[in-house]
Amino acid sequence: MTDGILPFMEQVKGLGYLIKLDTNGSYPERLQTVITKGLVDYAAMDVKNTAAGYAETIGLPEAPLTQIRESISFLKEGRIPYEFRTTVVREFHSSDDIREIAAELSGASVWYLQPFRDAPEVPRKGLHAPDQMTMEEFGSIGNRFIQTIIRN
């Protein structure tokens, strides 16, 4: 979450609008603040991969895993409606990865799996969506731990 978002959210809430927050979970203290202050009505958090695959998936040398786990734990407390979601990329996600992510999210309300969609603005070239059968298999694996929905 960018600096300065808090006053903006307060202004938007003051106008009577509902706020959905999309986050990658890197700033759990900011997430906790805006939710505790009643500024967020719904949160959606991207969970990119397992701990071992996270940095590669996000294209950085390191991933803020401690912060991401803290955000996951906080959202799982259920103070507001929320969802977790993973964009599934054939080159980054295996059945074992999906099982591990699902186990970590166990106890959460819902996890959406969505296939990767290539676009000109995607900085990394050569990535692919899994086929529909693989997505369904991944959904079945996820459902052993958490309600898992395939979003196309």
Residue ranges and their predicted role:
Residues 121-144, 149:
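Glycine-rich phosphate/pyrophosphate-binding loop and the adjoining helix
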Residues 1-128:
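Conserved AdoMet/S-adenosylmethionine-binding subsite of the radical SAM
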Residues 71-82, 138-150:
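A structural motif corresponding to the C-terminal end of an alpha-helix
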